[in-house]
């Protein structure tokens, strides 16, 4: 019965699938991640040697010795790690201040408790070096025995002796370097002696021995040298060791960089050990036992080699310290010429060429493997694949060596402020060795080589399983073919010629490694009897398996074959003379080829070692040198400590800052230079941290080192993401700014010679933005997500800056604000191709504080500017349709205080300094006025809601208080000052007389002190408010028309097509509709959408179609609202005495406005500002709006004082000076204002189409009898008061 699964369980199982990482199309621009996998190490260290009983007993015995020596070498490595990673404990332990201190005993007890385990390590180290020296000297003594001198010693055994020499050199230098070891032991010994822990004589003696051992410089080196000098003939054996190292170095018989450097160190230290009173290496050179010229060339080409970690050594220094040093024997090393290892640029062209060749070959092979499946590749194919793998490992090793050797040379040759001007005088030693010791070209070359190493490592690791299988098959086939086939001929001759030693060696080789088809050697093989094969040949079928030889098996085969071709064989003559030349060549070729098999069989570890650049981070040697202190200023040259009298500051620390760390130096160099060709390599230097952490865990096995790597990675990666995000944002912001920049403006700039970098160069950020799982210290980091978070914040800042910049400027900044937001929108669009950014409109709303509030910062600032600056200080000119700032500030309010925008980087504005200058010039032309561009920008930025809010506030907070406040008070006051009656004088008086008449009657108004200041200012504010609303509506209408035209295609609205004479427009229209049917929103949504979606689409379509068609007008509503504010009786005055119209009485507003118009029509003197300059046309608009809304337009045009003067002057054409007023000039001004008033009236009447005003289309006509002269009214009963007449009729 099947188990029932609930829906909840099923859903949870599905959700788990989200955690599975699926392969994606992420570009590979990072190193090989370190996987946590099980690795099988088949190196048995000769534990299975007893299984090869068929081998020569001598070599099995040698394997036993080998195994013991390897154990000592491993132990020596552990002691080297212990010394190198030793951190001073005594500095962290409190010391008693005086002998009277009460807790002195407690402190000493704790000191002993803490340091005792560490001191035991030092004791074990002392015991180990004694044991290792005894074992090494014992082997040397055994091999230098008179009976053994001519015996064959294998290259593997000589190499092991060389490793011992290297180990002694490393341990000795580490012991010399580590003063913290001595300090800690001194602290322990002082505490132990106080507590009497070391009471017995043996312990005291061992403590004394350890103290002397640690304190004596070069103790291990000198002990080894003294021990060897007591052995007769040791120099011959060491000569063999040195020669094998020279041979292997020159023929590149090594694979990992560590082995290469070990060979060089053995040459130097070996020659130092050989040179003594009894042996002169110069004489050995003369006897051709060693070749100093070859070693001299090696030492010059490789002047400095890594000793251990960040400790370096110049091998030639050993020669300089030797007893018989003769510089003439070392011409190259003694010269002052710089070593080739110091110049990476020399190696770079060859590295590039090798990289391109190998990568193309590897790519071809990879493609072949992935596209074709072969169950059993041929021997030739396996051989080619194995050679490909070997060449790859050799190239990686060579490139890694170049990097580490350059780094080593630089550490040993720090720069100073004389060589590098950028290096400060007070720079630290480590800082001078790393931070300031590389040129920009060297850093780029280093990055490129590291990228090649790590990139090739990734490619090879990807096909590791394929390569390993081919390697095993190839090694198996070559070994079996050689053993079963190639060795038949030398075996036949050895049997035939009765060369028993050669026969026994060859038979041992075959019995040790042959894998016969039937499980045993053919008994009828003629070779065993020394006979020739039959005419048909003797067929041996060699099997083909996917398995390689064991490490002991390979060692036995190679050693026994080497004994056949070696110059030493233990007899009077070498065995090689008894072997045929052709066979000798085959054996020699096999021996050389098989040297690399152990590396290839352990392909994964070898690949990792060949690419290991971990030592570029380690700095234990320099930390030891500085003791974790930074001397900021000390005027005396000496060993600095806390007792320095001239010391200003001394900072204690346990690590160097990241600015001195090579991985970050290289990473930061790419980020600082922004070099496009290097940008895709930026993750490779960070992989050095992976190497260092892996080395700390697997080789050093120190948690604190890993913790320090991790801490630096945390800091560096944060810096990396921050800097990279800023760069990416700046790049795309600059690109957006360049795209948005006016093309004609750019062209004009180029013509004038102002050349700014408009379009940024392509920096290849796209590849980095696609990185979703960067591997760092075992963490999978979504770089895309981290960059997205920061760029989201940058976008918010950029939009915030744009709005803040607008808030810091006047109303003219609205155009620049729109441009900034559009540039940000373009930047957002460009970045959204790679990043999941927040919605741009949402960002704008958030920055504008408009998410929940009805109006945002932009709307608020627009109103603030309107209220405190624009309406009160700007003058409108209908000819240009613009507002400009008034020349004289007549506003009673204080000047508006604007906050300055925050200071931010250039890229937050337009993208770059050059673009900022260009846009400042471009938008500078909009700062001197407020016109159509500004109103269109307001419409687009404020939207319907913002515009409604602004207009509503203008009406409530500006217009209404003005009308019912200051204007009403001024009107009441001036109505009192107006003459009770002011007629229209007859034409017979002439225009000068009419002017004099009005001048006399309107003296109080003309001389009213506040007329041209506060009164006109109030009218200007009112008029500007009305004009603003009108222009906003006009701009909004244009925007809506534009929207309609854009939407027409999606609403099945097409322009009438052009038709020829015989064509029917209906047919062509239908074809157009069919062609664009897929774009029709409503019809498509109705077909494929839900009923609700269809309804929404239809409503949206209807709203779009009829938005302008229904003829809605904001301005009409505003005028009606203003009309509702004119409810005071003073505006209309008392009812006319004649019941019809006030003709001569000055009781209505239009008569007051006529008087005010008379005032501002009076020409000013030459130095005075005109009313137009001071108040603009807002003044005229205010009066005209009030006249129209009060229904007084016709009577104003008929009874206006100025218009009457104009009419009379047109008749008589006179031009006189009437009490200082030039009549002709005044008439000209009146005419201009008359035209302006007419234009304003026509605009207002156009909008007030549905009211009862005098300008309405439908006129309400009332018929009245003609008026009579007052002199005849009393005698005539013809004329009656209309009101009384109505009453009589009603009655």
From Swiss-Prot:
Start-end of Polar residues biased regions: 1271-1291
Subcellular location as annotated: Cytoplasm
An individual GO BP term: cell morphogenesis
Pfam families registered for this protein in UniProt: CYRIA-B_Rac1-bd (PF07159), FragX_IP (PF05994)
InterPro entries, A to Z: CYRIA/CYRIB_Rac1-bd, Cytoplasmic_FMR1-int
Protein's UniProt keywords contain Cytoplasm: yes
Region annotation Disordered: where it falls in the sequence: 1270-1291
Disruption phenotype: Flies display pupal lethality with defects in axon growth, branching and pathfinding, synaptic length and organization of the neuromuscular junction. They also display defects in cell morphology with cells exhibiting a starfish-like shape with multiple slender cell extensions and loss of actin filaments at the cell periphery. RNAi-mediated knockdown in gamma-aminobutyric acid (GABA)ergic neurons, or specifically in the anterior paired lateral (APL) neurons or in the antennal lobe local interneurons (LNs), results in feeding-dependent socialization defects.
Function summary: Plays a role in guidance and morphology of central and peripheral axons and in synaptic morphology. Also required for formation of cell membrane protrusions and for bristle development. Plays a role in regulating mitochondrial activity, energy metabolism and membrane potential which maintains normal gamma-aminobutyric acid (GABA) signaling and ensures normal social behavior.
Protein name: Cytoplasmic FMR1-interacting protein
Organism: Drosophila melanogaster (Fruit fly)
